[in-house]
């Protein structure tokens, strides 16, 4: 029998402790909040209920709305998906929004949580394309979606040198998804946004190999690709009417006799050469191919997402996504969307000086910072800037360290979070004017 969960602004009886978050009566639990908009309080209560082994619940009573239902679901979710939540009947619009958030958020979490033996580079590209097709079919027209998956040696033949070099050491071939969501029906319609995601389905570090503890969660290094796919899916569910292109740059970074090595120099299709000083700085190498392709489309904005640097995670932990850009108006639009959706983002510095901190005697740029004390997240962004012609405008880089938690918190279970899906969907629907 499922437990009924009530929501109340009344203070719990002191028998449950001072300012108790939860109280119980037979097969009913009550969450005590100061007001009905207290999302974090509801999410914490859901985590506590899960911690007590409760897996089957009904949200009962008249005080539940879209945001409290969503907060409860966020806290109740677990990677094992061994739970059931029955929601109250909401009005049509919030009910549809709740289901869309669950659908898109669960896609992101599942992709990140699944093992690398399941989510190979080609499989990640395939599942992402299939998901966007399903969203387009459910909320509009499946014919709005077209895509191409380039894999293996064909990447080399088409000069996607970053993805091919990073992925050539694995038996699972690297892949690039090129997806076009065009609901206008006009093949010449302008592109609102190009989304470029890092899809490293497992990262050993390559010859700059990671220690075992750091490697244990590296199936999640495709979090940026999953996040952007889920965001586009939610934007479609919310009624996106403008053209958006999605590029996922997918590979496994492994050690083998065929793997790329330190000292190698990659020549990209835009003519930029990059020396490999650290094979564990591979994410920027694959993203470069996607950014070159995105830039060719002349979109109004380019957004890339990647679990790119440990430096960003050291700065903001698992609690925020880091934002780096020289376009203040675009950053402001992102933060407005984040405020609306109540998701955590934090801006880190990116300036011209960082572009001079990745120099090398053997190529145009190096794939790591080459100054004694460098800002790792900033120099990684600087590397990417060499693949966006007008990098000072209309380009936003997100170092998304909040995609996954290795340990639980009072808000989140171990595993993928889905943080950022709503914000980026909101930004696609509310872009910078002009």
UniProtKB/Swiss-Prot annotation:
Mn(2+) 1 binds at residues 203, 280, 282. Its cofactor is Mn(2+). PROSITE patterns: CYTOSOL_AP. SUPFAM superfamilies: Zn-dependent exopeptidases. Its main location: cytoplasm. It is found in: Cytoplasm. Mn(2+) 2 binds at residues 198, 203, 221, 282. Pfam families: DUF3663, Peptidase_M17. InterPro entries: Leucine_aapep/pepB, M17_PepB-like_N, Pept_M17_PepB, Peptidase_M17_C. One of its GO terms (molecular function) is metalloaminopeptidase activity. One of its GO terms (biological process) is proteolysis. Its EC number is 3.4.11.23. It catalyses: Release of an N-terminal amino acid, Xaa, from a peptide or arylamide. Xaa is preferably Glu or Asp but may be other amino acids, including Leu, Met, His, Cys and Gln. One of its GO terms (cellular component) is cytoplasm. Homohexamer. Belongs to the peptidase M17 family. This is Peptidase B. It comes from Pasteurella multocida (strain Pm70). The lineage of its organism: Bacteria, Pseudomonadati, Pseudomonadota, Gammaproteobacteria, Pasteurellales.
């Amino acid at each position: 029998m499922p437990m009924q969960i009530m929501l109340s602004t009344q203070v719990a009886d002191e028998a449950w402790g001072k300012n108790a978050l939860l109280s119980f009566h037979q097969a009913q639990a009550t969450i005590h909040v100061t007001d009905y908009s207290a999302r974090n309080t509801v999410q914490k209560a859901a985590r506590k209920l899960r911690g007590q082994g409760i897996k089957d619940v009904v949200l009962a009573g008249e005080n539940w709305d879209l945001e409290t239902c969503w907060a409860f679901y966020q806290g109740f979710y677990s990677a094992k998906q061994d739970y059931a939540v029955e929601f109250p009947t909401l009005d049509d619009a919030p009910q549809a929004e709740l289901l869309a958030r669950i659908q898109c958020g669960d896609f992101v979490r599942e992709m990140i949580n699944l093992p690398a033996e399941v989510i190979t580079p080609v499989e990640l590209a395939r599942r992402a394309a299939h998901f966007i097709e399903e969203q387009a079919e459910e909320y509009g027209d499946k014919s709005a979606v077209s895509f191409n998956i380039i894999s293996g040696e064909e990447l080399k033949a088409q000069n996607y040198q970053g993805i091919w070099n990073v992925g050539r050491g694995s038996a699972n071939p690297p892949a690039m998804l090129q997806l076009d969501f065009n609901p206008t029906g006009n093949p010449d319609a302008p592109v609102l946004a190009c989304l470029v995601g890092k899809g490293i389905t497992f990262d050993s570090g390559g010859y700059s190999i990671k220690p075992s503890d750091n490697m244990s969660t590296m199936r999640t290094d495709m979090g940026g690709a999953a996040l952007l796919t889920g965001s586009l899916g939610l934007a479609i569910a919310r009624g996106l009417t403008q053209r958006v292109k999605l590029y996922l740059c997918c590979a496994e970074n492994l050690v083998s006799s065929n793997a790329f090595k330190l000292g190698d120099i990659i020549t990209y299709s835009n003519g930029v050469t990059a020396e490999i000083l650290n094979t564990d700085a591979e994410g920027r190498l694959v993203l470069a191919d996607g950014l070159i392709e995105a830039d060719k489309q002349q979109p109004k904005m380019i957004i890339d997402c990647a679990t790119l640097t440990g430096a960003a995670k050291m700065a903001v932990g698992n609690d925020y996504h880091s934002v780096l850009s020289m376009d203040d108006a675009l950053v402001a639009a992102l933060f407005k969307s984040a405020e609306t959706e109540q998701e955590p983002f934090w801006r880190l510095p990116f300036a011209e000086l960082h572009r001079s901190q990745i120099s090398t005697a053997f190529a145009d740029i190096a794939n790591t910072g080459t100054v004694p004390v460098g800002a790792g997240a900033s120099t990684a962004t600087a590397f990417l800037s060499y693949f966006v012609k007008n990098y000072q405008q209309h380009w936003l880089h997100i170092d998304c360290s909040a995609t996954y938690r290795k340990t639980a918190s009072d808000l989140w279970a171990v595993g993928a979070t889905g943080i950022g899906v709503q914000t980026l969907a909101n930004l696609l629907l509310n872009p910078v004017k002009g």
